[in-house]
Amino acid sequence: MSTEIPDGICYNNITEINDFCEVIIMLNNVKNGSVKILPGVFRERMDVNRRYLMELDANCLLQNFYLEAGIILPGLQVVDDPTTANIHWGWEAPVCQLRGHFLGHWISAAAKLIASDGDAELKVKMDGIISELARCQELNGGEWVGSIPEKYFTRLINNQYIWSPQYVMHKTIMGLSDAYIYTGNTQALDILVHLSDWYIRWTGRAAETNPHAVYAGEEAGMLEVWAQLYQLTNDEKYLTLAKRYADAGLFRKLREGRDSLTNCHANASIPFTHGAARMYEITGDSDWLEVMKLFWKFAVTDRGMYSTTGMNAGEFWVPPHLQGHFIGSNDQEFCTVYNMVRTASFLLRYTGEKQYADYIERALYNGFLAQQNADTGMPTYFLPLAAGSRKKWGTKTRDFWCCHGTMVQAQTLYPEIIYYTDSERLIVSQYIPSRFEGEVSGHSVTFEQTTGMKYYNDQAFFDEKDDGQMSRWLLKFSVKCADNAKFTISFRVPEWTVGAPEIELNGEKITARVEDGYINITADWSDGTLQIFFPSELRMERLPDMPELGAVVDGPIVLAGLISADCGIKGADKLSEQFMPQLEHTYGTFPWRQNSWRTRNQPQSVMFRPLYEIRDEEYTVYFTGKDGE
């Protein structure tokens, strides 16, 4: 199915609406809708997510907005048996103070799928939901369009406890913004125009009576949405709102060089960086970019992380380099994975530094994929890393955790983080089967990448490889141009690459310069093919505070042992001698199944599989590694 999709908004030319000073952006996003995800594990995860979005009942998605607007749905005026009521439960239940948060995530995810896939059926459903939100807004007096009552914000001003009302409203605003950005739904923007008038008054009242209230109720995402709306409309009232949310204490502490994260709620702090990113884009003030870099320093560089990229336990930042002390059942909240990937993607665009793309790659496999059930699309709130763990999956209508919402968004993010451009290049940042159709250096280009992953032997493309070896990192690319066009294609060399990448251009082996972690190939393109092999090897990544414990990693992919306890690994300094590939798949049938391994030369033989393939099995990630045995 397909439908004509408007270009929407692309942030390639931010300086056009910036009246302050020049914004330096090293890498530009490609246009919405220019990237199509091709068959493979990422496409499969997008598809199961799309099925779930369509499966959910629109009335249930809107239930809390209806209740707030005084609309009673048939069958819900009197409920005799709650178990049979057609209603969403968990955090969406009408008695929960976070009720209604999920719909904003749903709208955002739907909008991005519509933009990337031209999904007409999903667009009809999304447009209908937005129309109903406009109806609710009218019944509420023309401004408020909340799933929660306005009085929750009065409680913030009065310093009375209430569970994160700004978090809830941020999701609604975010979803409506994305509906306008990605699909051109002007009704969504109209709703926001009127809702923002309510916020102008509320923040003004708060500033006069209790300025702290603006920074209460988990408000971290608010700065981004108001700054983004200023980008979209150039309406000064949104800039006013952005400025009212721009003086968070986190920013002051970061500028002072203080660790403002340790033992604090992780996901309540990460979205501040997204707001800083938008403020950098609308002001050009490099101080905002510096704040983002300082955040990354305290969150990642100086803190360390699990091999899966997790940096938190029980929702709180783990103290620097003490990850081993916090291994348990509540590691790596998924919301933090998603939001850190967004932070990394901003920093990648602004700086061009490869480290952020490497981080994103690892988070995709060990967060986005590992924390989504491949069958149902459901998330796991945390990613347990203790020995003998099992993932706890959410249900389709009875949980609706925060991570439930970020997961449906996460599975639509892939088209935005694979390709970038600058004035002369197409940059390939992630290796996900996909097709890009757009403009590079003034030329119309179609670029496609697929994986050559399969069992290969001495007849394989690289005949010097050992017999019986398997790799997913044999990558194939095709380039087609409307005319003969000279430009550069830059390919990220992953941080885990061992030795020199091996390259063929149009069937001929070539060498290419590597600069700042990228292979740069400049050619006169018309119709061309490329193949690149990134050599990798198994390695053990040890915990800084418990170096006796380590995770087995293959490229960017964390492996899990199918065992209920830490049985130890002898000879951990030479894992290639302790693990043998488990040739259990037919790669023509499962072209994106990652390698499985089985230990050898060990007291106990253990199967290892990618953590993202684990569903209901018991597993162990960190093992005692003994060198030289």
Q: Model-found features: residue ranges?
A:
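Low-complexity, Ser/Thr/Pro/Gly-enriched N-terminal "stalk/linker" regions
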Residues: 16-102, 124-150, 186
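Structural helix-adjacent loops and short alpha-helical linkers that scaffold large soluble proteins
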Residues: 25, 29-32, 36-39, 113-127, ...
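C-terminal beta-rich recognition modules with glycine/proline-rich loops and embedded aromatic residues
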Residues: 34, 242, 292, 357-366, ...
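Carbohydrate-binding/catalytic loop surfaces
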Residues: 63-96, 145-164, 213-229, 256-278, ...
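Well-ordered alpha-helical segments within folded domains of soluble proteins
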Residues: 96-115, 164-180, 215-231, 264-281, ...
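A conserved hydrophobic secondary-structure block that centers on an alpha-helix together
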Residues: 151-232
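Catalytic cores of eukaryotic secretory-pathway lumenal/extracellular enzymes that build
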Residues: 174, 199, 203, 208-210, ...
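Solvent-exposed beta-strand/loop surfaces of large extracellular or lumenal domains
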Residues: 498-523, 538-545
